[in-house]
Amino acid sequence: MAIQTSNLGYPRIGLQREWKKTLEAFWSNKINEEQFLTTMKEIRLQHVKVQQEKGIELIPIGDFTYYDHVLDTAYMLGFIPSRFSEFTSYLDVYFAMARGSKDHVASEMTKWFNTNYHYIVPEYEEGLQISLKDNRPLRLYEEAKQELGVDGKPVILGPYTFLKLAKGYTQEQFATILKQLVAPYVQLLSELHAAGAQIIQVDEPIFASLTKEEVQQAKEIYEAIRKEVPNATLLLQTYFDSVEENYEEIITFPVSSIGLDFVHGKEGNLNAISKYGFPADKTLAVGCIDGRNIWRADLDEVLTLFTTLQKQVQTKDLIVQPSCSLLHTPIDKTEETHLSTELFDALAFANQKLEELVLIHSALTQGTESISNELETYRNVHHTIRSSAARNREDVKAARTALKEEDFSRPLPFEKRYELQQVALKLPLLPTTTIGSFPQTTEVRQTRKEWRNGIISNEQYEQFIEKETEKWIRYQEEIGLDVLVHGEFERTDMVEYFGERLAGFSFTKNGWVQSYGSRCVKPPVIYGDVAFINGMTIKETVYAQSLTEKVVKGMLTGPVTILNWSFVRNDIPRKEVSYQIALALRHEIELLESSGIRVIQVDEPALREGMPLKEKDWDAYITWAVQSFLLATSSVANETQIHTHMCYSNFEDIVDAIRALDADVISIETSRSHGEFIDTLKHTTYEKGIGLGVYDIHSPRVPSKDEMYEIVEQSLQVCDPKYFWINPDCGLKTRRTEEVIPALEHMVQAAKDARSLLKTNA
């Protein structure tokens, strides 16, 4: 039996975020197109070289992108919206689709399955000519071969997942469009095979959650492709969960290899193999290293997995690989020497995970004695972190044990609370507000950097933050907003900020991962029990409230979002970690309330993304996610108004969960998803406070008052004006001041026009 090492995808951003910096330099015209393409090629080849040097045999090619791999596929297949037809060059069209332009909105952006990565949603339009517009995988395959002598493994997004992720067609059209994808995929695969590609990875993560009918439909497409490209060696790759429900059919697909996730789908995939076996004429690609977390693998557990598989699987070959692309992990832990030894030793970033694959390969091909020293080291590391004081706090355990049913609910129902809040807050009809953050200018970032480096004192930094806060309180008053925010100038990141102030968290210096486009985040590491230490937002919020007679809302990140946007310890259930965070936030919310803050927003933008892929697993997740939010927010008085915020999700799946949060007001992204949630509300009722975002803050364009008014008008057809709020889609941290002020002025004017119309029609 031949055993090979493989990788599914490598982080794009570069060890020092060179990729991000190159993109942003190009967008701001600091480098020209030639410089951009040259630098990107250098980064791309360096990533291939690293994997080659680590000993990976099947190196992914084509996983590198200038923005997003789904967008790459859309462009490659000609899924280019007609509104971008005025652009002629590849990069102009590509980035207009991703980011919008002065006159045109960008394509929608949403979460990649249940991760914190965002992809650009492909758009289908009537009359679209689907064809292979650009065989990018072929170019990159030949580049790696010529420049580095690497015969790589081209990686492409499969036709079924691609079309399932796209929008703009009816369900009745799906089968017809799917068949139209056969020809370009045949051409793509034929050209790769002709160029010498030994194996081609076709990603179909959607296979984890298909119906029987959909799997049959997908199989027919693969049979049509195989008929035209009989000799190409295809690896059908699944990840993020098991394919247990459809395994029996999937193993009959006309492909040479099948990749399964034995981390996030371990139980289901093992059950399926035990029941149905695995074809002797196919190669099994075993996703055995967690591609979504940062902890060292349990090598004993992984080797036990292979022992089990080798007893049950009569395959000719095995491939050792991560559970999914390493896109979701930082690149290398070597710079994180500031961390405690017990934590540093327990980590494995992308490069360390590649080394783990090689270790496992050695154990499988040469025997476990060949890695006996490494096995002993790994066992000691796991024992040390499991038994650490940080993971065994008695006070945290006692607080969890003491929870009672009444800790998870507000005293009065929403309608009665809202009446009391209206009396207390005295807000107009259709109140206006923002989501929380204001522009983090170069000056803000530079001043924070100087403070962190000890160049300026704590007092100087606090004075600067107060100056920025007062400036934006005045801007908000002049614009005419009804509920103000302090602006969050003291925060780098909405999760990192809280993690730095809670027990149980640690932070990397260079643990960046891509969120969307050039936007990178540095997730906190939850390595121990989470507990409240001191007030985290009191000082800045109370100061902002002291500057104005208007209501200022406190701003917190919710427990489920902190959980889902962190790298989380894997020794206890995620539910328990979420409850620990909720208890800490509950303390903070009580402090805000006792300090006179009457509106408190607890953001949960990541609630939806944490949902399991399989519908049968949704209820369990939603139950503890909602309970976590309620645990954090339910101890306040009825007169205190709790807000929450969500963005970029498939909301129709969680309308009931949103309702169960029992927030007094929820603000939701609407504009970039082109009114999708408004459509959802046409088929259901939402009887609590709600603000549907009236403009897309991820695009630099300033929308007109009329555009926003149109969204307000559409929203009021499905929402009760008594409970309706007007706000942007998300926080304004990434926008420039000259974009923010006119956009908010237009928004306030749209609100005034809507109020006038409502009064006229009353």
Swiss-Prot record:
One GO term (biological process): methionine biosynthetic process
Entry's Gene Ontology molecular function annotations: 5-methyltetrahydropteroyltriglutamate-homocysteine S-methyltransferase activity; zinc ion binding
The reaction(s) this protein catalyses: 5-methyltetrahydropteroyltri-L-glutamate + L-homocysteine = tetrahydropteroyltri-L-glutamate + L-methionine
One Pfam family recorded for the sequence: Meth_synt_1
InterPro entries: Cbl-indep_Met_Synth_N (IPR013215), Cobalamin-indep_Met_synthase (IPR006276), Met_Synth_C/arc (IPR002629), UROD/MetE-like_sf (IPR038071)
Binding positions (Zn(2+)): 645, 647, 669, 730
Active site (UniProt): 698 (proton donor)
Sites where the protein binds L-methionine: 435-437, 488, 603
Binding site for 5-methyltetrahydropteroyltri-L-glutamate: 17-20, 111, 519-520, 565, 609
Family to which this protein belongs: Belongs to the vitamin-B12 independent methionine synthase family.
Name of the protein described by the UniProt record: 5-methyltetrahydropteroyltriglutamate--homocysteine methyltransferase
Organism: Bacillus thuringiensis (strain Al Hakam)
